[in-house]
């Protein structure tokens, strides 16, 4: 494989500058909600959703979804029930959000804002 030729006085373009130079639809985006919130919201909307579908909709790997599910279970935000070969999840909507800034709100507030709207 041939090395990429550059002018000796040319500086490499950083990933950030390359991303900003891309058209808006190609730029990597950011969101106000975390991947944990996205996974929780999808489960609240569809309790029998497959991890593959969660991964596709959130834009992360299935392995990342598994880790998030484990975090949510450890925090008692969700319960997993085995139904045949599938899982059914129950969201504990009465629990508070985790960060001190939003801890005065319950999970149900977030779900009603995004899913139930």
Task: Please tell me what each predicted stretch does.
Residues 37-42:
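Pre-recognition alpha-helix immediately N-terminal to the DNA-recognition helix
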Residues 47-48, 59:
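Central "turn" residue of the DNA-binding helix-turn-helix
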Residues 56, 73-74:
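Alpha-helical residues within the helix-turn-helix
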Residues 25-36, 50, 82-105:
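Short, cationic-aromatic polyanion-contact patches
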Residues 2-24, 96-117:
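Amphipathic alpha-helical dimerization/coiled-coil segments
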